[in-house]
């Protein structure tokens, strides 16, 4: 689960971090009034969506004219913003963030992630703020400095000072940076973050550290113990199919291909997508029905896959460990009959009751293409998607 920038900054403020005064507005009139309340003669207005690249897409504007704020809000509210991180439909804009304008002398980067390699929370800092950190990591990795947080001792001020020294901060800025670092580390642990970014973390003309942006991703598995964070969820930013799948405990991610995939197990699902790609196809989705799949969940998975008009063929790849292949076969048959599937369906069953599952499919009278191996399944589904 992701938070909007205005929500992230509200959390920053709760932990004593320096942020700009700002208001998230639902209407153009509110945006104009917010600028008046903030005061000053320059403001920044930003579309609130769960995607980066807003500035290049026209979703951020710096202005000293309140009528331009009104025009910006009227233009974007209720529309979709398309950036390089969204699909072609973009993300809906329901709020506009109006903030005071901050003078910038230098831009830095500060972020944290749960790193699987070290099994620790790792903070990253760089002098290359204001640009995509992935680009910095690829082109100039030596400019990214790290601090690994020991879960037993927690974050330490010396780690902040070490990062600050590498960023070239002066003693006053070092104290401010240490406060920001310690606050973010506590926030990360308190609220079960999976990702945190301030890009850019700026040094103002007065020489002060300031959080100019905020990006937060929450570990979805921890939401049951984070009611405050859970209430911040904006369902309008979710893919409708992904949100629907979650209700049935299906792990679904929409992609842009034409081969629908239904698999049990995340690893097998990724392997299935890889082999479809290897044989010239493009997966339309990632869908893991899980080890405890039922006939109802399989039927619902079919409905979700087929709700994508780009899907030209469906590959069902099931390895029966916990789940029984004959039960999956019955679910497939029920789904095909209920939904009225009009695209080719390729099925590969292995494991518990696999032979029985194949017999169930063979005796169903439905036009289902059986596959003997994963390679055979990939070849057949790619050919079917191409109409061969």
Swiss-Prot record:
InterPro entries assigned: ATP-grasp, ATP-grasp_succ-CoA_synth-type, ATP_grasp_subdomain_1, Succ-CoA_synthase_bsu_CS, SUCC_ACL_C, Succ_CoA_ligase-like_bsu, Succinyl-CoA_synth-like
Superkingdom to which the source organism belongs: Bacteria
Keyword line: ATP-binding, Ligase, Magnesium, Metal-binding, Nucleotide-binding, Tricarboxylic acid cycle
One example GO MF annotation: ATP binding
Cofactor(s) listed in the protein's UniProt record: Mg(2+)
Binding annotation for substrate: 264, 321-323
Enzyme class: ligase
Domain ATP-grasp: 9-244
Gene Ontology CC terms: cytosol; succinate-CoA ligase complex
Cofactor note as given: Binds 1 Mg(2+) ion per subunit.
Pathway: Carbohydrate metabolism; tricarboxylic acid cycle; succinate from succinyl-CoA (ligase route): step 1/1
Gene3D superfamilies per UniProt: ATP-grasp fold, A domain, ATP-grasp fold, B domain, Succinyl-CoA synthetase domains
GO terms for biological process, alphabetical: succinyl-CoA metabolic process; tricarboxylic acid cycle
Catalysis: reaction(s): succinate + ATP + CoA = succinyl-CoA + ADP + phosphate; GTP + succinate + CoA = succinyl-CoA + GDP + phosphate
Entry keyword Lipid metabolism: no
Residues annotated for Mg(2+) binding in this entry: 199, 213
Enzyme Commission number: 6.2.1.5
Binding residue positions for ATP: 46, 53-55, 99, 102, 107
Family: Belongs to the succinate/malate CoA ligase beta subunit family.
Protein role: Succinyl-CoA synthetase functions in the citric acid cycle (TCA), coupling the hydrolysis of succinyl-CoA to the synthesis of either ATP or GTP and thus represents the only step of substrate-level phosphorylation in the TCA. The beta subunit provides nucleotide specificity of the enzyme and binds the substrate succinate, while the binding sites for coenzyme A and phosphate are found in the alpha subunit.
Record PANTHER family: SUCCINATE--COA LIGASE [GDP-FORMING] SUBUNIT BETA, MITOCHONDRIAL, SUCCINYL-COA SYNTHETASE BETA CHAIN
NCBIfam families in alphabetical order: PRK00696.1, sucCoAbeta
Subunit structure: Heterotetramer of two alpha and two beta subunits.
Protein name per Swiss-Prot or TrEMBL: Succinate--CoA ligase [ADP-forming] subunit beta
Organism: Shewanella halifaxensis (strain HAW-EB4)
Gene expressing this chain: sucC
